Amino acid sequence: MIKITVPATSANIGPGFDSLGVALKLYLTLEVYEETSEWQVIHDYGANMPSDVNNFIVKTALLLAPNLTPHRIVVKSDIPLARGLGSSSSALLAGLAMANVLADMRLNNDALLKQATALEGHPDNVAPALLGGSVAAFYDGEQVYHAPLSLPKDINFITFIPNYELLTTEARNALPAKMTFKDSVAASAISNTLTAALNAGDFNTARVLIEKDQFHEQARAHLAPHLKIIRDTAHQLEIIGTYLSGAGPTVITLVSKDNATKLLKVLTNMALPGKLLLLEPDYTGLQITKNN
């Protein structure tokens, strides 16, 4: 049996639109068993999720290795679908990794990242999911350029997952068609300074900049009303660092372990319609183990 584990991811981290992301300790697991005459995909997603060759993971694997022998596979995931936690990226990477192993292609991480980004269109989820930790990345249509970001050792991610889905296409359609040159410069400067602050270990600056996005959050605010609610609540506790995870609707607040309990207690008492999780960064990324 081959076991492939891929972490959830939170993209953008505020102003790092389509370029910054972090892996979180919430996982999709793919178990690959015996060869079969046709692909068999066992999962608990319900009847709307294909259980044969039309499954997204299998289709992704066949894009990389079209002649791949069918197998029986089992998919388990704690990553909710269409919530802004990289569920599609984790599934995509699981499919590519399965093809890489079964077809003995021996692609390294750079090659896998290039394949994944070409399929996904941007690297902010697939890069941290593959490599672990927090990553800044850029794709020019041919190559993926990436570098790690530093996170405080005691950082926690208070994660509110609303009880409704938000498709990426809907969230993308909410974005402005263009920005003025002046606004683009300002938005880019905020993202650049956030990256520098994180790598300098200046979390006091970083957490302020996390809330100063000018690329997407304002345009998507009506799709994720809990962003303002949670941010305002955190501010009342003098906690700064709340942002919309990926395309939303999940909302994340970066906090120290000391502040995590305080904010989590208040948010729990608010009984928001969704799930609250206290997550830590995943620093290992995609993992593959083989058991005879």
Swiss-Prot record:
The gene is thrB. Its EC number is 2.7.1.39. Pathway: Amino-acid biosynthesis; L-threonine biosynthesis; L-threonine from L-aspartate: step 4/5. Keywords: Amino-acid biosynthesis, ATP-binding, Cytoplasm, Kinase, Nucleotide-binding, Threonine biosynthesis, Transferase. Catalyzes the ATP-dependent phosphorylation of L-homoserine to L-homoserine phosphate. The keyword Kinase applies. It comes from the Bacteria. It is an enzyme of class 2 (transferase). It catalyses: L-homoserine + ATP = O-phospho-L-homoserine + ADP + H(+). The keyword Amino-acid biosynthesis applies. Pfam families: GHMP_kinases_C (PF08544), GHMP_kinases_N (PF00288). This is Homoserine kinase. It comes from Leuconostoc mesenteroides subsp. mesenteroides (strain ATCC 8293 / DSM 20343 / BCRC 11652 / CCM 1803 / JCM 6124 / NCDO 523 / NBRC 100496 / NCIMB 8023 / NCTC 12954 / NRRL B-1118 / 37Y). Belongs to the GHMP kinase family. Homoserine kinase subfamily. GO terms for biological process: threonine biosynthetic process. SUPFAM superfamilies: GHMP Kinase, C-terminal domain, Ribosomal protein S5 domain 2-like. GO terms for molecular function: ATP binding; homoserine kinase activity. It is found in: Cytoplasm. One of its GO terms (cellular component) is cytoplasm. InterPro entries: GHMP_kinase_C_dom, GHMP_kinase_C_sf, GHMP_kinase_N_dom, GHMP_knse_ATP-bd_CS, Homoserine_kinase, Ribosomal_Su5_D2-typ_SF, Ribsml_uS5_D2-typ_fold_subgr. ATP binds at residues 80-90. Signal peptide: none annotated.
